[in-house]
């Protein structure tokens, strides 16, 4: 598929590098757009992209572009995705999809109306290790889920700190990395939580969250704890406890390894390495769905995306945390 990239930041560079390595699969980078021509030109030169533009509008209007990867800050996702869809482009939008569920619903409806593919780029959902984990849970290998814990933290600094904390850009730990925790819990349970309690939250001087600890209860009684912070280094680990065993993931984001322990058996280390860096699976899924004429993925569905968007929105509303310009 012929890709355009909207924005030229760090995550866009990772996406471009991944597509570069997927040329044999038919993936191509054909255009990039930025608000600044110099940025677009430098990006295009780095990744051998034939065309560069100094506006998102001209990128979206390029007739050679089939699909666009949206890599702008959180609060811009809605308007950027809408622009691309209205110009007849398939869209893969960086997570978090939108800052509120109403925006998300509008975009998915627009994609259906225009018969275009739209998916949130929540890459960990499609990792091979999680396919294996789903199989283990479905087989009842560790019994019924009883308790899940997951944590993710890093220290945002420099220019990255300004963007991560900026209320006008939809900053804060919950939307930036908490989505990994909450998405991981949805991978395991396949459900919305019945109850969400904020045990701790810290809102910084910028008006965004840099730390929170959530307690969630799922149908069937499974309890979960999610810790997310952009002010402290935490290992990205997770533990799943069932009635007959447990699973430990030393890194549940870049998930390639887990240890399965079942009563009466020796611990088993399961490895499912990625082909490139993990982004390749969302790119393959987008191409697969476009070829099949689908408007959404049947693996990471619009319903899953909407559920996570709603969960994060309701959580931050319970904190009284609104982004700059948000009613």
PLM regions with names:
Residues 1-47, 321:
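N-terminal Rossmann-like dinucleotide-binding module
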Residues 47-110:
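Beta-loop-alpha module in the N-terminal Rossmann-like domain of NAD(P)-dependent dehydrogenases
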Residues 53, 93, 118-120, 249:
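Hydrophobic residues in well-ordered beta-strands that form the structural core
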Residues 58, 67-69, 219, 288-327:
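C-terminal helix-rich "cap/oligomerization" subdomain common to oxidoreductases
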Residues 105-123, 144-146:
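Rossmann-fold dehydrogenase core element
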Residues 124-196, 204:
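Predominantly a Rossmann-like dinucleotide-binding segment in NAD(P)-dependent oxidoreductases
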Residues 183-257, 273, 285-294, 326:
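Contiguous beta-strand/loop segments that form the cofactor/metal-binding neighborhood of enzyme cores
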């Amino acid at each position: 598929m012929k890709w355009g990239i909207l924005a030229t930041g760090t995550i866009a560079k990772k996406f471009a590098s991944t597509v570069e390595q997927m040329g044999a699969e038919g993936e191509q980078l054909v255009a990039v757009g930025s608000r600044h021509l110099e940025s677009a030109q430098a990006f295009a030169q780095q990744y051998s992209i034939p065309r560069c533009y100094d506006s998102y509008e001209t990128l979206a209007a390029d007739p050679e572009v089939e699909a666009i990867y949206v890599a702008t800050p959180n609060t811009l996702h809605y308007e950027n995705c809408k622009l691309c869809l209205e110009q007849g482009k398939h869209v893969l939008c960086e997570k978090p999809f939108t800052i509120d569920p109403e925006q998300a619903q509008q975009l998915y409806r627009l994609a259906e109306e225009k018969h275009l593919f739209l998916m949130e780029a929540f890459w960990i959902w499609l990792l091979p290790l999680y396919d294996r984990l789903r199989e283990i849970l479905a087989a009842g290998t560790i019994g019924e889920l009883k308790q899940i814990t997951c944590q993710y933290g890093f220290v945002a600094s420099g220019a990255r700190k300004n963007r991560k904390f900026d209320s006008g850009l939809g900053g804060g730990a919950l939307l930036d990395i908490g989505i990994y925790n909450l998405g991981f819990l949805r991978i395991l349970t396949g459900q919305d939580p019945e109850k969400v309690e904020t045990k701790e939250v810290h809102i910084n001087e910028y008006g965004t969250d840099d730390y929170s600890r959530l307690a969630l209860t799922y149908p069937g009684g499974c309890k979960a704890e999610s810790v997310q912070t952009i002010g402290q280094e935490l290992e990205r680990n997770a533990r799943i406890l069932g009635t007959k065993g447990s699973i430990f993931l030393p890194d549940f984001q870049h998930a390639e390894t887990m240890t399965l322990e079942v009563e009466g058996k020796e611990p088993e280390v399961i490895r499912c390495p990625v082909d490139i860096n993990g982004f390749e699976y969302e790119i393959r899924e987008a191409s697969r769905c476009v070829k099949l004429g689908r408007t959404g993925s049947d693996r990471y569905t619009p319903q899953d995306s909407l559920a996570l968007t709603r969960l994060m929105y309701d959580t931050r509303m319970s904190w009284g945390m609104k982004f700059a310009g948000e009613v």
